[in-house]
């Protein structure tokens, strides 16, 4: 796949054009990812509501029926449930690693086996997320790509 970029002052917002001979999985993935860049999730920090972009979120988890979104520097709370956020962010590269947690695969730095034989996903912010057995195949596949 080739990438051409052209910076031009006449464009007020970025445009993405795709040229392809055949619709492949890779083409579909690029399309879904580009479309996901315009998605925002409203989330609360202290007394303010912010619009978070998927690219800023490292992982999302539910604790005691509350949904938390973790970025590099803050933890936000969302009124949405994890399942609805997961469906919204699937094209943006979010994958489930536990019943109550999804991670941004683009923030996944490495995987390691912990002392008690659990697999941990290590994110770019040095956060270690335990992956439960039923989701190991999915995260291994995401890591291999």
PLM region descriptions:
Residues 1-145:
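Basic, polyanion-interacting recognition surfaces, primarily
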């Amino acid at each position: 796949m080739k990438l051409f970029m052209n910076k031009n002052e006449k464009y007020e917002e970025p445009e993405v054009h795709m040229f392809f001979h055949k619709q492949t999985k890779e083409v579909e993935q690029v399309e879904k990812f580009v479309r996901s860049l315009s998605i925002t999730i409203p989330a609360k920090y202290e007394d303010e509501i912010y619009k978070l972009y998927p690219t800023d979120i490292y992982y999302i988890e539910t604790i005691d029926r509350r949904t938390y979104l973790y970025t590099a520097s803050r933890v936000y709370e969302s009124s949405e449930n994890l399942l609805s956020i997961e469906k919204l962010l699937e094209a943006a590269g979010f994958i489930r690693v536990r019943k109550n947690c999804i991670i941004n695969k683009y923030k996944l730095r490495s995987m390691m086996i912990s002392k008690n034989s659990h697999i941990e996903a290590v994110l770019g912010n040095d956060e270690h997320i335990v992956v439960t057995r039923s989701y190991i195949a999915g995260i291994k596949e995401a890591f291999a790509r």
